[in-house]
Amino acid sequence: GYVSNILHDRIEIGDTIEVAPPCGEFFLDVSEKHDRPLVLLAAGVGITPINSILLTSLDAFPERDIILVHAVLNEDVQAFRSSFDALAQKNKNLKVYYRYSETPFISATNASNGFVTAEYLESILPGRDADYYFCGPQPFMVALYHGLMQWGIPASQVHFEFFGPRQELERAA
């Protein structure tokens, strides 16, 4: 991104830089009690903050049911797959699914071709009442936000990281 390019292009070893703590609002609040399942949805590099939320939840709420869906072009560009598979083996309350938009061959039983849509989620979720966290490219975000709003999911159960003003996402949906 913008800051990464500046760091690589202008900062030298030994330089001092001033940083501030993270200012984001996309995190799992571990001070609250969580009775509903946690649904984590990511496309592409949107998996990075979702991975952090997953690890936080497994640590803070080891009995909570978690469904993780990661959408990417194909298996070759999928980050964290071996980690997610290992976590699912270790945590029976964690279900992991992969969606590939460009792969004709899929080697895993928990993987399928297509996009992450409300219809797809309906086929894998035990029910709609859950806490939803999602991050990814704009078309992914718009489709999920629109689908969750159509389902009548309360805003308090919908959490996302959108790279742009929230109003843009709401207008697009």
Regions found by a protein language model. Name each.
Residues 1-40, 53-59, 73-74, 85, ...:
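FAD-binding FR-type
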Residues 28-29, 60, 150, 172:
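Short amphipathic alpha-helical leader/targeting segments
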Residues 33, 61-63, 126-127:
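Short, flexible coil/linker segments at domain boundaries that flank nucleotide/cofactor-interacting
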Residues 43-44:
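Polyanionic, low-complexity intrinsically disordered segments
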Residues 56-59, 63, 152-154:
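Classical protein tyrosine phosphatase
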Residues 66-173:
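Reductase modules of NAD(P)H-dependent flavoproteins
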